[in-house]
Regions:
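Cleavable N-terminal export/targeting peptides
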Residues: 1-24, 253-274
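N-terminal, post-signal peptide beta-strand-biased segments of exported outer-membrane/organellar beta-barrel
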Residues: 17-82, 258-260
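Outer-membrane pore/translocation modules
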Residues: 21-24, 84-186, 250
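Short sequence motifs at beta-strands and strand-loop junctions characteristic
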Residues: 37, 67-70, 95-97, 125-127, ...
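Hydrophobic, lipid-facing positions within transmembrane beta-strands of outer-membrane proteins
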Residues: 43, 54-56, 72-76, 81, ...
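Short, solvent-exposed coil/turn segments at beta-strand boundaries
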Residues: 52, 78-84, 108-113, 140, ...
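A structural detector for beta-sheet-dominated domains
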Residues: 61, 79, 88, 106, ...
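Outer membrane beta-barrel transmembrane domains
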Residues: 146, 156-160, 164-274
C-alpha cells in the first residue's frame, strides 16, 4: 500500500484513499479569515458570527477523477445567525466509513468575532470528541486577522491522534481593488511549524452590482514548514446569495488532478427593520 505524504494527508486529504481521518474538504481551499458562510464551521467557527446570516451548503468530493474516480466525501451544514450544525461522511478504502457531526456557536461585536465548534467522530468503532475555538477581527478596513486552535483534547480517531494545532491567518483586500483578496495562514503544532498556505481570490459582480450571476475565482498553494510545495487548489463559483462552485486539487507539482469537489451555498442576511 502506498503511503500518502504527510502534508497532503494534513491539508487536502478528503480525497486520499489511505487516510483513516479526512479533513473537511473546505479546509483544502478556504482560509480562516476569508469564510463567513456555513462552511466556517469546519474552517474557523468565528466566521459563523461575522455577518449574522442564515446559510446552508452541501459539498461532494471525488478522488482521482476520471474512469477510476471514487466518491470520497459528502458533507453539508447550516448556519442560523451563529448557531451551526454540519455532517461529514467519508468513504475510505476497504469499505471503511467515517462520520463526523459538528456543532458550532459564534457571535460578533464591533469587528471582533469569536466562536467554538465541537466535533463528534463516529464509525468503525470510533467514538471521540474534539473541540475548536476561533477568533477573527476586522483590524482595519480591508484587513482581517484571525486564529483558530483545533483538536483541543487531541481526540484519537480510528487509531490516529489528532494533534493540537494553532492556525493564525490574515486576509487583505486592497482599497484600490477591493474585489481582490490575498490570504495566508500557518499550521503550527506544539513542536513545529507544520505547514503554510497562501491564496488569492477575485469576486466579480458584488452585491448591488449589475451582474446577476457574478463569478468568483480562488487559488491556493499549500507548502510544508520548509516552504516546499505540497498541494494546489483552484476554484470557480457562480452566483451571489445562491452560489454553485467547483474546486480542483493537485499535488504541489501540478502533475495531475487528484481531487475535485462540487458545492452549493445559499445565504440570506437579515432584513433591517425600519
Amino acid at each position: 500500500m502506498r503511503r500518502a505524504p504527510a502534508l497532503v494527508v494534513l491539508m487536502a486529504a478528503p480525497v486520499i484513499a489511505t487516510a483513516q481521518v479526512a479533513p473537511n474538504r473546505a479546509t483544502a481551499y478556504l482560509h480562516p479569515t476569508d469564510v463567513r458562510d456555513a462552511r466556517a464551521l469546519w474552517v474557523n467557527p468565528a466566521g459563523l458570527g461575522v455577518l449574522r446570516e442564515a446559510s446552508v451548503y452541501a459539498e461532494v468530493a471525488v478522488g482521482d477523477p476520471g474512469a477510476r474516480g471514487r466518491l470520497r466525501q459528502i458533507n453539508a451544514g447550516f448556519n442560523a445567525r451563529g448557531l451551526a450544525f454540519g455532517y461529514q461522511r467519508d468513504i475510505f478504502d476497504a469499505g471503511i466509513r467515517g462520520h463526523t457531526y459538528r456543532l458550532g456557536l459564534a457571535g460578533a461585536s464591533a469587528g471582533l468575532a469569536a466562536g467554538f465548534a465541537t466535533a463528534y467522530y463516529r464509525g468503525e468503532g470510533t467514538k471521540a470528541t474534539g473541540w475548536d475555538v476561533g477568533v477573527s477581527y476586522e483590524w482595519r478596513q480591508g484587513l482581517a486577522l484571525g486564529t483558530v486552535i483545533t483538536n483541543i483534547g487531541q481526540p484519537v480517531v480510528r487509531g490516529l491522534r489528532q494533534r493540537l494545532t494553532f492556525i493564525p491567518g490574515a486576509t487583505w483586500h486592497p482599497s484600490a481593488i477591493p474585489t481582490v483578496g490575498v490570504s495566508a495562514h500557518a499550521r503550527i503544532t506544539p513542536d513545529s511549524v507544520a505547514a503554510y498556505a497562501f491564496g488569492v481570490s477575485w469576486q466579480g459582480g458584488q452585491r448591488g452590482g449589475g451582474s446577476r450571476w457574478p463569478v468568483a475565482i480562488i487559488a491556493r498553494l499549500d507548502t510544508d514548514g520548509g516552504l516546499r510545495r505540497g498541494a494546489f487548489a483552484l476554484g470557480l463559483s457562480i452566483g451571489n446569495r445562491d452560489r454553485i462552485g467547483a474546486v480542483a486539487s493537485t499535488p504541489g507539482d501540478v502533475s495531475t488532478i487528484d481531487g475535485v469537489s462540487l458545492y452549493g451555498v445559499s445565504t440570506r442576511e437579515p432584513v433591517k427593520r425600519r
